[in-house]
Amino acid sequence: MRLFYAVFLPEEVRAALVEAQTKVRPFRGWKPVPPHQLHLTLLFLGERPEEELPDYLALGHRLARLEAPFRARLRGTGYFPNEGTPRVWFAKAEAEGFLRLAEGLRAGVEELLGEEAVRIPGWDKPFKPHITLARRKAPAPRVPPVLFGLEWPVEGFALVRSELKPKGPVYTVLEKFSLRGEHGREQAQGPGERPEGD
């Protein structure tokens, strides 16, 4: 099964991204990502045996207990690669929380898989939080940058299965993980104290 961890977006952010996609719709070479599939990938796992699924679910729950909700910012658009012929048009996202989640997931997967983790496609690439807006399928021009300046609360992430179909990938959310930040609360309360409401 083809798996990845991702953050999905609230309606107001998704609406702004869909509006930005109108910039590339006149050009048939660009294929916009369907609105319901817009997301920020935290870690791509590639094709994994189904028997490993419980480990990835447990990792998500463990990290969600440690990390607190945070606010993220949507900046402007960019291209991968930045020079030469672009393949991907994306929106840049910013938040230390994205980096913490990505690093925590990566460390957990390394612990689970050991040296095998380096065989995951893209494992050696640095994490750059972004939301893919469109992919270039044929010759098409670059479009002027779009600036957003939006903020939104990130309260969780998900483990997602991706099935590749002739018309494009189909995503299925296998599990959602709500950020609870228990580790940070325990540190603030001191030893022996229990969080309120637990």
From Swiss-Prot:
Gene3D superfamilies: Cyclic phosphodiesterase (3.90.1140.10)
Segments carrying motif HXTX 2: 130-133
EC category name: hydrolase
EC number assigned by the record: 3.1.4.58
Catalytic residues identified in the record: 39, 130
Motif HXTX 1: positions: 39-42
Catalytic activity entry: a 3'-end 2',3'-cyclophospho-ribonucleotide-RNA + H2O = a 3'-end 2'-phospho-ribonucleotide-RNA + H(+)
Any one GO molecular function term: RNA 2',3'-cyclic 3'-phosphodiesterase activity
Keywords: Hydrolase
Domain of life where this protein originates: Bacteria
NCBIfam families associated with the record: 2_5_ligase
Record's function text: Hydrolyzes RNA 2',3'-cyclic phosphodiester to an RNA 2'-phosphomonoester.
UniProt similarity note: Belongs to the 2H phosphoesterase superfamily. ThpR family.
UniProt name for this protein: RNA 2',3'-cyclic phosphodiesterase
Taxonomic placement: Bacteria, Thermotogati, Deinococcota, Deinococci, Thermales
